[in-house]
Design a protein with these regions (language model features):
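Active-site beta-loop-alpha junctions enriched in small/polar residues
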Residues: 58, 87, 168, 218-220, ...
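Flexible glycine/acidic-rich beta-alpha junction loops that bind and position SAM and/or redox cofactors
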Residues: 88-92, 175, 224-225, 280-285, ...
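Residue-level recognition of beta-strand->loop/alpha-helix junctions
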Residues: 7, 36-38, 184, 273, ...
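Glycine-rich beta-alpha loop elements in corrinoid/cobalamin-binding modules
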Residues: 2, 10, 17, 21-142, ...
Length: 487
């Protein structure tokens, strides 16, 4: 069988969600080709070649762009079988012929081969939570079928750039934050990726030039003993390789005994979903932390020389102007201006189907109709001025970043827009904070500009993307985001 696997957006990383199923399919004798629309142009000849095509949709942005691409396939090859797989697979139900979520690899192989349904599926047959990833002997992810690492996001540190690899040591999450897409599929469960499989994939990426590894688990400390073991072994084998990971505030504090070893093993920064400084909002989201906990987590990581890169979701149905101001003051007071990509000051809660927030009693008064084109429910703030402020800040950040302004300069512009005095930091004040050239998001709804450009010519190198989602392709996320993974 000639199988075409397509990725549309994976945060600027070389798509693991193509490499793993490609390896499994190839090991079973199938002819597999991959296309990553983050960096590759659309190729109708590949569509003509394929016997079936499957789209990887690990997040909302990827799903929305996949809808555009599927429409192209339907025009060219109406009869071609199409699958959508990944965390957001179910969002393509009715658009793709087969949709799969959760632990998708075995189910995708079964679909390609037309075999019977597998054990581990839910009643819908969509969500699969088998434990294949923990089994030894799986083939190495087929990264040879993907564009080289140097075409993807890089680490910026000390005025230089380093090539970045990407792995996942676990899937799912033990927590059920209401705004996160992960519990919709995993429902508080995690699936461990076999230890040696993770290390072997790291090794092949180091051989390909990676000098930094991103652990893309929804929360790297969900299986803390497993993660420590992986980090320890990676550092023993590759002592010069650095890394970053995503960790929930609650876990930063609970597992504070790991940070000394992580720092000594090359941990440069931790992504953590702070979301809001309003404790009532954090409670509604079931985040499991408070603003005071966030401050403590910054101090814990800093004590070990590890930077924190917070993600924020300032605009929810409960947001007030005072909340926005308090968030900006928190960033300033804790010396985090250079650690926050300015787009995070503009992010608005996204509510896809299945969101655990939909049945929250305090959401009902703000919830509007489902928008099929956006793939999410519309909602409104009680004060229309808050919705207007979000749009104004989004336009401001877009314009400033497009003009090449530095992070401190953009931050001061945002502060001025909400009536706060500028901090007056030097434009270079953020230069010594390690970051990736791709802004970190979980799930973002792309702008109309992105979707139009993706439909016309979906090609843009992630390495050249800006801090915010205003490039004319799928290489960067937009300002409208589902909350980050539980971190």
């Amino acid at each position: 069988m000639r199988v075409l696997l397509i990725a549309t957006y994976e945060l600027g990383h070389q798509p693991l969600q193509l490499a793993v199923p490609a390896a499994r399919l190839r090991a079973r004798g199938h002819d597999v080709r991959c296309r990553d629309l983050q960096v590759d142009a659309w190729d109708p000849e590949l569509v003509a070649w394929a016997d079936c095509v499957a789209f990887s949709v690990p997040m909302h942005t990827a799903t929305q762009i996949a809808r555009q691409a599927i429409a192209r396939v339907r025009v060219q090859r109406p009869e071609l079988p199409i699958a959508g797989y990944g965390l957001y697979g179910e969002m393509l139900d009715g658009i793709a012929d087969r949709v799969i979520a959760g632990e998708t690899d075995a189910a995708l192989v079964a679909w390609v081969e037309g075999t019977e349904e597998l054990e581990g599926a839910d009643e819908s047959g969509i969500v699969h939570l088998g434990r294949d990833a923990a089994a030894p002997g799986a083939p190495l992810p087929a990264r040879d079928l993907l564009p080289p690492l140097d075409r993807y996001a890089h680490l910026v540190i000390d005025g230089t750039e380093r090539t970045v690899g990407y792995v996942e040591a676990s899937h799912g999450c033990a927590h059920r934050c209401r705004h996160c897409p992960v519990p919709v599929v995993y429902d508080g469960r995690i699936r461990i990726v076999e230890h040696e499989a993770v290390l072997a994939d790291i090794a092949q990426q180091v051989d390909a030039g990676a000098r930094h590894i991103t652990f893309g688990d929804p929360d790297f400390l969900n299986g803390v003993h497993h993660s420590v073991r992986v980090v320890r072994a990676m550092h023993e084998r590759f002592p010069d390789v650095t890394f970053d990971c995503t960790v929930k505030v609650e876990h930063v504090l609970r597992h504070d005994d790991v940070w000394a070893e992580f720092a000594a093993s090359g941990c440069l920064f931790v992504v953590s979903a702070f979301e809001s400084v309003d404790d009532a909002t954090l409670t509604r989201l079931d985040k499991g932390h408070t603003a005071a906990d966030m401050a403590r987590s910054v101090a814990v990581l800093r004590e070990h020389g590890i930077a924190v890169r917070p993600s924020w979701m300032p605009f929810t149905p409960w947001t007030t102007l005072d909340h926005i101001r308090a968030l900006l003051e928190f960033v300033a007071e804790h010396g985090l201006v250079g650690n926050v990509d300015p787009v995070h000051y503009t992010i608005r809660l996204l509510l896809p189907r299945g969101s655990l927030l939909l049945d929250h009693p305090e959401m009902q008064a703000h919830l509007d109709e489902y928008d099929e084109a956006r793939g999410s429910y519309r909602w409104h703030a009680p004060d229309p001025a808050i919705d207007e402020l979000q749009q104004q800040l989004a336009a401001l950040v877009e314009a400033r970043v497009a003009a090449g302004d530095s992070i401190p300069v953009v931050s001061d512009a945002v502060r001025a827009a909400v009536g706060l005095a500028p901090l007056g930091l030097a434009p270079t004040a953020a230069d010594d904070v390690p970051r990736l050239t791709e802004s970190w998001f979980c799930c973002a709804e792309p702008t109309a500009l992105q979707l139009d450009a993706a439909a016309a010519a979906p090609v843009q190198s992630a390495r050249n993307s800006s801090l915010v989602a205003f490039q004319p392709a799928a290489s960067v996320p937009s300002i409208v985001k589902n909350a980050a993974p539980p971190s």
